Amino acid sequence: MVGFITLAVFIATFAVIYRWAEGSHLAVLAGAAVLVVIGTISGTYTPRMAVQSIYFETLALIFGMAAISALLARSGVYAYLAAGTAELSQGQGRWILVMMALVTYGISLASNSLITVAVVVPVTLTVCFRTGIDPVPVIIAEIIAANLGGSSTMIGDFPNMILASAGKLHFNDFIGGMMPACLILLAVTFLFFEYRQGDWKKAEIPVDLAWVRGEQLRYSDIDHRLLRYGLIIFFITVIGLVLAGPLKVRPGWIAFVAGLTALALGRFKDEEFFSACGGSDILFFGGLFVMVGALTSVGILDWAVAWLEGVTAGHDRVRAILLMWMAAGVTIFVGGGTSAAVFAPVAATLRLDGDGQAAWWALALGIMAGSCAALSGATAGALAMNQYSGFVKRHPELASAAAAGLQFTHREYVRWGLPLMGIFLVLSTVYIAVLAG
């Protein structure tokens, strides 16, 4: 009975989040509190157990990388890179998509996709409307590139930070295990968009010439002091992460110290501090870990492991691949961070021949594929949609041009993202089968 109630509270919490995305950290904290109360009354989940279920290293990673990313973003270098890349595309639709997706991938290697999309999408909208190119395919490609970039490294986005803590993985492990696969999938993404988009002349939209003459691509002013501090802290952090394994130091605490330094030097205003240190994300994942701990305490995750073993007849390689596909499906609805927290204990039970870390890469690739399938799964999907609609509202003279192109809706995104998820999963299945062989 307690297990049923625990599962019901977990599902209800994420139903609320799915319906009202804003304030998701408050919903998770409330759900965590309810589960701790239920567990305490029933004797199945005490406050001590709740604290022990939290991956504090993941929270340290989130804090540190959020602070470093905020410092670099505040310096203006990300916006400058995006504007420079857009200008190099020379107004050609195909090159706008490729180059903006590449810069998105590059920034996402070290910054979470929310920061990346917040910087890149406004530049993309200005460039596309100025050149009469439908921006929707380009923005969709950028969201997918952000997911791939975040999945390539340990510090790129939240799911990998969780898996790093759960699997005791290091920075170099992700470079060797995830980056090659993600680079291949990025190349496949470009081929897919070239095939689907075809003739870019069909993507041309009629734009008010008066708006084009008045709207220029603006380079962001760079604060060289903040940029210098940000780059020094970032490169020292990366060196520390690379050496963390040989030095037997956990990466999260290196990132934590770097984050404290970034906050001290970043000139953040009082109202910016909470956001700069990833406050909402830390609260969300802290509460999420407590909720997943409650599921574990009542045996729900043990049941899931037993079910997987039964379905796959004890073949760990098949189990890892099935886990990857399951994680992709769940991620579409609850997002990558939640899937990572829920499935990490399951991945920890897999013992594969060949690359012993292949189970973690299977889970990471499944989460990445699911994140690409729908806006609800993509960390920055809702932000990109809001930026698009806000841009058109601020420039009503572009309404007819926007109406002539693709409409940036959940349904339109799925038309691109869902087939890509299938392609990613098929290729990732081959990759994991080879690694685990």
UniProtKB/Swiss-Prot annotation:
Induction: Part of the probable 17 gene mamAB operon. It is a multi-pass membrane protein. It is found in: Magnetosome membrane. It comes from the Bacteria. The chain crosses the membrane at residues 26-46, 53-73, 95-115, 136-156, 174-194, 229-249, 252-268, 281-301, 320-340, 358-378, 416-436. Keywords: Biomineralization, Ion transport, Magnetosome, Membrane, Transmembrane, Transmembrane helix, Transport. InterPro entries: Cit_transptr-like_dom, Diverse_Ion_Transporter. One of its GO terms (cellular component) is magnetosome membrane. Pfam families: CitMHS (PF03600). Disruption phenotype: Weak magnetic response, very few, small magnetite-containing magnetosomes. Near wild-type localization of MamC. Magnetosome vesicles are approximately wild-type in size, shape and chain-like alignment, only a few have crystals. Deletion of approximately 80 kb of DNA, including this operon, leads to cells that are non-magnetic, lack internal membrane systems, grow poorly, have reduced mobility and take-up and accumulate iron poorly. One of its GO terms (biological process) is transmembrane transport. This bacteria makes up to 60 cubo-octahedral magnetosomes of about 45 nm in diameter which contain membrane-bound crystals of magnetite (Fe(3)O(4)). Expression of just the minimal mamAB gene cluster (MGMSRv2__2365 to MGMSRv2__2381), including this gene, is sufficient to form a minimal magnetosome chain with small magnetite particles. Plays a role in biomineralization; might regulate pH in the magnetosome. Belongs to the arsenite-antimonite (ArsB) efflux (TC 2.A.45) family. This is Magnetosome protein MamN. It comes from Magnetospirillum gryphiswaldense (strain DSM 6361 / JCM 21280 / NBRC 15271 / MSR-1). The lineage of its organism: Bacteria, Pseudomonadati, Pseudomonadota, Alphaproteobacteria, Rhodospirillales. The gene is mamN.
